Amino acid sequence: MASPILTSQRHFYSIGHLFPCGQLLERSRFNRRSKQLIWLVQFIRKAMSEMLPSDKLAIIDSFPLPLCQPVRNHRASIFKGLADIGYNASKHLWFYGFKVHMLVTLSGYILNYVVTPASVHDIKVVYELLEGCKQSVILGDLGYLSSELKKDLEQEGYHLWTPFRKNMTGAEEHNNWKVMAMRRTIETRFSELCRLFDIEHTLTRSLAGLQLRMEQIILAHNLRYFEMN
């Protein structure tokens, strides 16, 4: 389950007898009920986002969700027809699975996410990711560098900032280190999701199970941004 110590549901159930509530719901029954309540978890997450104070800035990025070791990329059959092979530039790694695209505030609150096959380019998901976004300034990495995308987003009321490549005119002036540092905070959030919730590893074998896991992790992550009285 999503906790700083327990990232395995099996491990959680193995110590269930330590809780004062006594007998826990049987695992398969718990999972069936949880999947039936995906809509509720999603509703709570979106309602929480509406409660956030207005902010001008948000950050977009993606991370890999591999389903097997690279050596099995061309033999994997899990999620056949849905997952595929993609390349992760930051890790210099080809992987089979999905890609998770996220929209995050500067403070680290996850506003939205989209899961796609691994081969889908980041630019293809931007409009879906920004659906309902109240932030007007969007920071992205070189994967979002596109004059056409920038122009189209400006017509939608968004200002997209990405760094320039080093060989581009005006790159040294444009690539302000303060803005670059703000953009990199999303990488810190991804590291936290991996460390606390093991988000890059999943044993689920169904789309409903994958969606439930993502919704649970994001909800647990976002809850800490609200003062619980």
Where is each model-derived feature located?
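Short alpha-helical elements
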Residues: 1-229
